[in-house]
Amino acid sequence: MALRFPRFSQGLAQDPTTRRIWFGIATAHDFESHDDITEERLYQNIFASHFGQLAIIFLWTSGNLFHVAWQGNFETWVQDPLHVRPIAHAIWDPHFGQPAVEAFTRGGALGPVNIAYSGVYQWWYTIGLRTNEDLYIGALFLLFLSAVSLLGGWLHLQPKWKPSVSWFKNAESRLNHHLSGLFGVSSLAWTGHLVHVAIPGSRGESVRWNNFLDVLPHPQGLGPLFTGQWNLYAQNPDSSSHLFGTSQGAGTAILTLLGGFHPQTQSLWLTDMAHHHLAIAFLFLIAGHMYRTNFGIGHSIKDLLEAHIPPGGRLGRGHKGLYDTINNSLHFQLGLALASLGVITSLVAQHMYSLPAYAFIAQDFTTQAALYTHHQYIAGFIMTGAFAHGAIFFIRDYNPEQNEDNVLARMLDHKEAIISHLSWASLFLGFHTLGLYVHNDVMLAFGTPEKQILIEPIFAQWIQSAHGKTSYGFDVLLSSTNSPAFNAGRSIWLPGWLNAINENSNSLFLTIGPGDFLVHHAIALGLHTTTLILVKGALDARGSKLMPDKKDFGYSFPCDGPGRGGTCDISAWDAFYLAVFWMLNTIGWVTFYWHWKHITLWQGNVSQFNESSTYLMGWLRDYLWLNSSQLINGYNPFGMNSLSVWAWMFLFGHLVWATGFMFLISWRGYWQELIETLAWAHERTPLANLIRWRDKPVALSIVQARLVGLAHFSVGYIFTYAAFLIASTSGKFG
């Protein structure tokens, strides 16, 4: 008999029902569970798939460059970045007739186009690209890298080129390679690009392959580097009247510490960023030489961990046993990587708007809103994934004998204290925050707004003042003209910082009040509850008082039958599933807050946010309802406008989201009966009954239906908010 899907599990391939298909898809990437898997093949498969991932990323970015060069208006946009709308690509087949064609023909295009809200135009402009030819060359180069990556993936699956398990487990070499080779060298290379191409480009000088060996990035060349007079590279920076992309007001400095923003572009100084990347390169190049490999010098990570026994015996045997535990568990390593990447992605969201790195991006409000929201949602999914793999580690890879009385074992030993403290924090935050909001709602409803409970966030205001914000009148540290830090800051480091933090036209340290205090605590509630669910899922993954043998049931199980009542919904997977809803909920509050505060800032009526954000009705009426009106008007009796595509996506997002509940609220029995009835009807319908199936149709398992429901809920939720965000922002600011 021919091999049926899935080839990696012969047991599943012989399943006579449609379960074969869904379980096959669900376990396709769970390499550990496949037939005939060895540790060696497991590592090699994952290694090869990384190359495939890189190939897809390079192909995707190549496509961005190619479509903008082919169908965009990059060269026109470069002439006037503030008033020309950047085009992402053409719309091939605009439906709905002539009104649609007219509505979507913009940005100086000849036909219907999509506007880019990704910030790529600002990014490419900042790093020195100026023409469509530049974009095409970039696209071809990335296409080449994509092909090389695919070749690399194929090569490392060939017997001669397969790395051994010992190579994969050589932690010191990998750390050195990634720290020095990946971060260090690439940061140094990026500094080189900024100094040799981007900074001259910002001063109106085009440096390309044909002249980059002739153009000195700095008048004195490498002289100051070799004579130790490095400060010469910081002298004569661009002036505050510098026009970006021209020589007017330009200086000659290449590595500076100016601080603040370029007055015209409202983005960080390119020379500051070059300096930053050089410093990062220096640090990482050193860090990549710290671990012992073939040369017998440097640290052994195992020795470091073994030696690290905290004083007083309070953490038992400290980090003994951790090296082998982590180095032999791919799930532990993936959990650590995802936790780090999740935090970094969220930090990217926070810093992209407050410290914009790309020229003119701060004035493109829709792009700012889209990038913030995008990075926060990505961060949420990555962070929940970190806990999922942490839980799988405890179920599949954790060895109690190997970790006796070390920090990992002690986490499990006092998990009740950890979980109950998190529970207490969540309850406290939830009841108090909701109590304040509801009290204020009632006061507004009764016509006595002066009886609201409004709490000034004085500690946060004090922290902002310490960083130099003067409007609160705290007169402390950098906001005090008498402090040594203030005086040093004027000359030695970041003289532009204090101007930037007290300037009202950027998003640096926004002024905060009672509305911010409340929403901050609502977000804290969401973060703590999400963390509670995830931490409990991981710490109880091996077993709990209710179900001591839980680890024998694996990561995801629906229940342990009727004989052990109450074992439903307690698998580690169920914790992940619940946590994703809370994660989405929390990021909803975060993005609502960010967006509403910024809309009022950009429109110059911050009082609307300040007055309406202290009670729930204010959020519902003055943020959600007020800003969705343009969206709902995408189609109206007078035809359609350029927001109509977002109006459609808003409706479609709600549809997908609502479909999620069909899977989340009805379970297997209902679907099984429905499927059997439909199959009966099919088999008795002429013509239709000519179509037969080999697999007996059965309903999804409870766990699978939950996954499908969760996927629809998440995708619909994000689609709906994306349409709302882009339409309400672009509708106001063009």
Swiss-Prot record:
P700 is a chlorophyll a/chlorophyll a' dimer, A0 is one or more chlorophyll a, A1 is one or both phylloquinones and FX is a shared 4Fe-4S iron-sulfur center. Keywords: 4Fe-4S, Chlorophyll, Chloroplast, Chromophore, Electron transport, Iron, Iron-sulfur, Magnesium, Membrane, Metal-binding, Oxidoreductase, Photosynthesis, Photosystem I, Plastid, Thylakoid, Transmembrane, Transmembrane helix, Transport. SUPFAM superfamilies: Photosystem I subunits PsaA/PsaB (SSF81558). It is found in: Plastid, Chloroplast thylakoid membrane. One of its GO terms (cellular component) is photosystem I. It is an enzyme of class 1 (oxidoreductase). It holds the Pfam family PsaA_PsaB. The chain crosses the membrane at residues 46-69, 135-158, 175-199, 273-291, 330-353, 369-395, 417-439, 517-535, 575-596, 643-665, 707-727. Its EC number is 1.97.1.12. It is a multi-pass membrane protein. Phylloquinone binds at residue 671. The keyword Nucleotide-binding does not apply. GO terms for biological process: photosynthesis. [4Fe-4S] cluster binds at residues 559, 568. Chlorophyll a B3 binds at residues 662, 670. InterPro entries: PSI_PsaA/B (IPR001280), PSI_PsaA/B_CS (IPR020586), PSI_PsaA/B_sf (IPR036408), PSI_PsaB (IPR006244). It catalyses: reduced [plastocyanin] + hnu + oxidized [2Fe-2S]-[ferredoxin] = oxidized [plastocyanin] + reduced [2Fe-2S]-[ferredoxin]. Chlorophyll a B1 binds at residue 654. One of its GO terms (molecular function) is 4 iron, 4 sulfur cluster binding. It comes from the Eukaryota. The PsaA/B heterodimer binds the P700 chlorophyll special pair and subsequent electron acceptors. PSI consists of a core antenna complex that captures photons, and an electron transfer chain that converts photonic excitation into a charge separation. The eukaryotic PSI reaction center is composed of at least 11 subunits. PsaA and PsaB bind P700, the primary electron donor of photosystem I (PSI), as well as the electron acceptors A0, A1 and FX. PSI is a plastocyanin-ferredoxin oxidoreductase, converting photonic excitation into a charge separation, which transfers an electron from the donor P700 chlorophyll pair to the spectroscopically characterized acceptors A0, A1, FX, FA and FB in turn. Oxidized P700 is reduced on the lumenal side of the thylakoid membrane by plastocyanin. PANTHER family: OUTER MEMBRANE PROTEIN, OMPA-RELATED, PHOTOSYSTEM I P700 CHLOROPHYLL A APOPROTEIN A1-RELATED. HAMAP family: PSI_PsaB. Belongs to the PsaA/PsaB family. This is Photosystem I P700 chlorophyll a apoprotein A2.
